Design a protein with these regions (language model features):
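Long, low-complexity, compositionally biased intrinsically disordered regions
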Residues: 1-177
Length: 177
């Protein structure tokens, strides 16, 4: 039987902080600065305590256009009624149920992300898929039609300005710490 080896980078996702740093240090475009002009209009939390995961969906707005921006966290520690909730973070699902979880680590917690904007689709989705941090189905293979330079020459996973804005908001709300 032939042994198959898979590089470790394809077996685990990437922490939010690494995607954020890749984006802010790897590109000339100041996404972090333009993210400040993105409005996070609505956040919806989807709790999945039986699978120890949380989905965060947001409607974001920039330049009068709306985008669906999503993050998915696994290995989340949900707290029960008897657990110490003093240092916990909480969120409410659309049905009004409140959940308490250990704060999600900004630097250590792996994440899967997706945004409906074209910048994310063309610049990051392929590379996020390669490292396991893309939420949902991978994009169709890109067929280059011009001689222009690649949009992501370093081939690094990252975040669009809408995902940066959502990350900043989740940190402000202390959901990410």
């Amino acid at each position: 039987m032939k042994e198959i080896t898979v590089p470790i980078q394809y077996l685990i996702e990437t922490p939010v902080s690494a995607l954020y740093t890749n984006t802010t240090s790897g590109f000339d475009t100041p996404r972090q600065q333009t993210a400040g002009r993105v409005q996070v209009v609505k956040i919806v939390y989807i709790a999945a305590p039986t699978s120890n995961s949380v989905g965060v969906g947001a409607t974001t707005r920039s330049s009068a256009k709306q985008y669906e921006t999503k993050m998915f966290f696994e290995n989340v520690d949900y707290l029960g009624d008897g657990d110490d909730q003093a240092n916990a973070t909480s969120f409410q699902t659309p049905d009004g149920q409140e959940y308490f979880v250990q704060p999600i680590s900004y630097t250590g917690q792996d994440v899967k992300v997706r945004c409906s904007c074209l910048d994310f689709y063309y610049r990051f989705s392929v590379w996020n898929n390669n490292d396991g941090s893309l939420l949902g189905d991978p994009p169709d293979p890109y067929v280059k039609k011009t001689d222009s330079p690649p949009i992501n020459p370093k081939r690094i996973p990252g975040l669009c300005k809408h995902l940066i804005a959502l990350t900043d908001r989740l940190r402000q709300e202390r959901f990410l710490r």
